[in-house]
Amino acid sequence: MKLYDSYSNQLVEINDELISIYNCGPTVYNHIHIGNARPLITMDVLYRFLKKHNIKTKYVLNITDIDDKIINYALANNLKELEVSEYYFNEYLKIKKALNTLEMINPKVSTHMDKIIDYIQKLIDKQAGYFIGDDVYFDTKKALNYGQLSKRDLENDIVGMRIESAANKHNPNDFILWKKTNKGIMWNTPWGIGRPGWHSECSCLINTYIGEQVSIHGGGIDLKFPHHENENAQNQVLYNKNLAKVWMHFGLVNINNEKMSKSLNNFILVKDLLAEYDYQVVRWFFYQADYKQPIKFSHEIMKQNEKEILKIKNAIYNAKNYLYFNNQLKSLTQIDHFELFDERINDDLDFVGIVDLIHISVKKINILIKENKDMNELKLNLTQLLYMLDILGINFVDLHNDENLALLNTWKNYVDKKDYVKADELRKQLINIGIL
């Protein structure tokens, strides 16, 4: 498998015996919007593919449940921070399930504070952490090739961009590891009472759950700087290596030609989208573009995706009906690989090529049914389609149970006997079920 690495700007082959994945998860102070869903769904496809091929995989997606946004929300609403974060964490789990994503490890920042404090102490011991009063800062000059991941000019581009301002910083790009505070939740440390900076949390969790280097680190492209750059800098200081072998960055979701974000107040919550569209449609939307590139959202686009999903579903049900009427449904088996599809997944998750393959497969199935072609070829094309959709996390309810098959058989008998009145009545029932 080759994936595009944002650090080297090259395709990098991943062939680790155990492929480890870390995906930057949500800050749980609100419901997630569809921009947050893109990394979740894209990485789920990769994870499904690896598991399907029995490749040892460890997938970690963190939960940031300590953050100024959470604290401010809690104070404004007379709540405890962890009450807020726990509520939205559980809402996030519901969304993950509704989107049909596989389970992964979800460590919370709040339950790993001892590890984070130890991690920061190691940076201090390496003389990469220094004090300004009771705050601890990271000295970016101690990191090898700082700025390489985000491809920024340190002197001209980075200064002033989401960098904590403080007098007496060694370098304008230095960032906070631990900040003293008397507001909100806090922990006691050898350096005083406070809470950690955002960048140390993720790098520490990777170190805790995976080790000195993760195979694949994913996240939205808007996290490349400063978050991922600063994660990487800490790891370079501690272990003299990049934090990840491959940095995967996912393109933004745009609405009205603007980045969708909570700060711009132009976001659409996933829970609201799922109230309007089936999860299959939402997932299918994200496969319409290269995962690295921006993707445009509109309800017109979603309606088109809805039509395409219906066409795919109808092809599957029609093929199963056809096989049933020809006594071939029971002999339908699963496959564990499909070379054309696997090649596209292994080629940096070529979603555009995969979508084309699925459209071709649906067209073939419809032609084979219409022209009463070779039954084995129909079964092969159907199993290939089901294999592809399963890895894309798109499944449909199997309506071909004994009860529905009996109804289908009765309907077919009415048609054969030209009893069209009864056939039409039963056909309406089968349409309501969804099998016709």
Curated annotation (Swiss-Prot):
Membrane-crossing segments per the record: none
Gene Ontology biological process: cysteinyl-tRNA aminoacylation
EC number: 6.1.1.16
UniProt-listed CDD domains: CysRS_core
Segments carrying motif 'HIGH' region: 26-36
UniProt superkingdom: Bacteria
Molecular function as annotated in GO: ATP binding; cysteine-tRNA ligase activity; zinc ion binding
Cofactor note: Binds 1 zinc ion per subunit.
Record-listed ATP binding positions: 262
Top-level EC class as recorded in UniProt: ligase
Keyword match Cell membrane: no
Renumbered ranges of motif 'KMSKS' region: 259-263
Keyword presence, Ion transport: no
Residues engaged in binding Zn(2+): 24, 202, 227, 231
Record-linked InterPro entries: Cys-tRNA-ligase, Cys-tRNA/MSH_ligase, Rossmann-like_a/b/a_fold, tRNA-synt_1_cat_dom, tRNAsynth_Ia_anticodon-bd
Keywords linked to the UniProt accession: Aminoacyl-tRNA synthetase, ATP-binding, Cytoplasm, Ligase, Metal-binding, Nucleotide-binding, Protein biosynthesis, Zinc
PANTHER family from the UniProt entry: CYSTEINE--TRNA LIGASE, CYTOPLASMIC, CYSTEINYL-TRNA SYNTHETASE
Entry's family note: Belongs to the class-I aminoacyl-tRNA synthetase family.
Known partners and oligomeric status: Monomer.
Official protein name in the record: Cysteine--tRNA ligase
Species this chain originates from: Ureaplasma parvum serovar 3 (strain ATCC 700970)
Protein's gene: cysS
